[in-house]
Amino acid sequence: MDSRVSELFGGCCRPGGGPAMGGNLKARGAGGSSSCGGPKGKKKNGRNRGGKANNPPYLPPEAEDGNIEYKLKLVNPSQYRFEHLVTQMKWRLQEGRGEAVYQIGVEDNGLLVGLAEEEMRASLKTLHRMAEKVGADITVLREREVDYDSDVPRKITEVLVRKVPDNQQFLDLRVAVLGNVDSGKSTLLGVLTQGELDNGRGRARLNLFRHLHEIQSGRTSSISFEILGFNSKGEVVNYSDSRTAEEICESSSKMITFIDLAGHHKYLHTTIFGLTSYCPDCALLLVSANTGIAGTTREHLGLALALKVPFFIVVSKVDLCAKTTVERTVRQLERVLKQPGCHKVPMLVTSEDDAVTAAQQFAQSPNVTPIFTLSSVSGESLDLLKVFLNILPPLTNSKEQEELMQQLTEFQVDEIYTVPEVGTVVGGTLSSGICREGDQLVVGPTDDGCFLELRVCSIQRNRSACRVLRAGQAATLALGDFDRALLRKGMVMVSPEMNPTICSVFEAEIVLLFHATTFRRGFQVTVHVGNVRQTAVVEKIHAKDKLRTGEKAVVRFRFLKHPEYLKVGAKLLFREGVTKGIGHVTDVQAITAGEAQATMGF
């Protein structure tokens, strides 16, 4: 990495630790024309001693798509130009699903020109007017001086523009929390969501536990959800200044929903279900500084990689260790992340600039893995994680979202409740389409392969009423007096026009990650596909008699209990004891309800 650019953004990056500048910042000697007459030629390392740098630093050229916009300056635009700028801002906000980043003082080809103080002030004033016009808020993320070939101080300014889309109450991001038992997952979430530091004995996590045995043992055994909000100015909104989840939702323009998963190996099936069913945008992998990579840490890391869930790492409990111990744990993580099969670029976050950069790099490149070192007791570096979460944009683009919303309604049933005076309530994620209050849907498959009609009475997101649910959003749906006994986890609620198909036999292309001996016909495994979790038997291995660790094959599975709703292309994960494998569904043998009753023995 060029030291000039590193100094420009105050970034700090460990050797081999990846980039530390904002928006893929890099230096180029030749490449593109420069309107300010920057010299061309071979790039040099370092600054000129005792003088200004001659080689201008660059960002990558501006992309037409995405939520990042470069502007050299925005000084006194004409009315026509202003309207064009407003339209452009709407486009960038749409691309970022409510968030956009403006780089002021940067040309379209990425050249960091910078602006004098008066021009920067005028440009930010225009940006404020643009934001007001579209109903957005702006926050200055950082300012840095650009001092090559100029005696006049020049700056570039990075600005976050945030606007909650008209069809949403707030921006939403789901983060699954992984890590070994006793690494501090629930404690960290308690500190973030309650606004109070831990006392070193687990006080912060008590409000997160759902069962008495969890409080007694201090270990999570079930999936729980916690929320952290940010207002339009980037300030944290949590239970320290809000009594209820409803108040947090009302005060926030962005919501982070943490999915707290179990760390103990005994509850691994619950952790896998949380990753496959709740469709997290990304995952937070917690590693204790004093134990390093231990227990289920590697297994959880492998799950995130297998399911292609982007993840970042938090090294906790740094207050318990010497600095050398923390550094050893970070080096251990960096070695694992760079190994074949992982191929990640670790980036150690040590400053607010690093946190801003990490959020942008993480969204743009799936290979970048930010690493935070913090303490839930002393609060050390906790603010850096909050900055990262505030700036982190949605990881799916607007086009993908629009395509999903154009499809027919499909809602995954992950949880089932009975609420007094409300009736049966189901919780889950809308995989595709749009769901409204009063919609008529069908739910299934039942044990005998049927789909039953029902009506959506009301919808809630984060305990707040919601009239419309869109693809990718998680919510609870009230079903009135629908019989709870007819429902189970793994079902789907779909539009009647979809004419859903079910199967008891399906084929998948798999990779056997580990098996002690040979994987043969007749072997039984627990299959996870989305919110489906059921025991299946291997009926056939195509073109082979057996499989060994690391081998690939197309395998035919048969569910043992009841038929399921599966789609071709869905990611698949199976396990039984130490046996593990991943793959995707390649074919489903559709059957009718009558055939299901015959084949499943009803």
Swiss-Prot record:
Residues 40-50 have a biased composition (Basic residues). Predominantly expressed in thymus, spleen, and testis. Expressed at lower levels in brain, heart, lung, kidney, and skeletal muscle. In testis, specifically expressed in spermatocytes and round spermatids. GO terms for molecular function: alpha-aminoacyl-tRNA binding; GTP binding; GTPase activity; identical protein binding. GO terms for biological process: nuclear-transcribed mRNA catabolic process, no-go decay; rescue of stalled ribosome. Residues 29-39 have a biased composition (Gly residues). GTP binds at residues 179-186, 260-264, 316-319. Induction: Up-regulated in thioglycolate-elicited mouse peritoneal macrophages. It comes from the Eukaryota. Keywords: GTP-binding, Nucleotide-binding. This is GTP-binding protein 2. The gene is Gtpbp2.
